[in-house]
Curated annotation (Swiss-Prot):
Disulfide bonds: none annotated. One of its GO terms (biological process) is translation. Belongs to the bacterial ribosomal protein bL12 family. This is Large ribosomal subunit protein bL12.
């Protein structure tokens, strides 16, 4: 009996963020590909599309001076365990959360910056 796409999707859905990152890196290495999104050159309509952005990514660029507070903030925001949150903080720059609303992104950015991290919203 072979493994179906649904079996794989269910297994990935149960993984932590750090496990998914490790899986992606292993797949990139095994198949010689990159998971980076292709950049498409936009014409005059590109500005209108950017103005209508509804999903945002929160990127932590540095954990700053107080790593412990940042790890606590990461755990609270993502639900990660201590080990995973520490690994995420130490692997900056890293996407903390992706495809979230502007309000969620702003709140997360505020929480992380109050803890001492450097954060960008993309």
């Amino acid at each position: 009996m072979s493994i179906t796409k649904d079996d794989i999707l269910n297994a990935v859905a149960e993984m932590s963020v750090m496990e998914v990152v490790a899986l992606i890196e292993a797949m990139e290495e095994k198949f010689g590909v990159s998971a980076a999104a292709a950049v498409v050159a936009g014409g005059a309509e590109g500005g209108a599309a950017a103005a209508e952005q509804t999903e945002f990514d929160v990127m932590m660029t540095s954990f700053g001076e107080n790593k412990v507070k940042v790890i606590k903030a990461l755990r609270g925001a993502t639900g990660l365990g201590l080990k995973e949150a520490k690994a995420m903080a130490e692997s900056a720059p890293v996407a903390v959360k992706e495809a979230i609303t502007k309000e969620e992104a702003e709140a997360l950015k505020t929480d992380l910056e109050e803890a001492g991290a450097s954060v960008e919203i993309k």
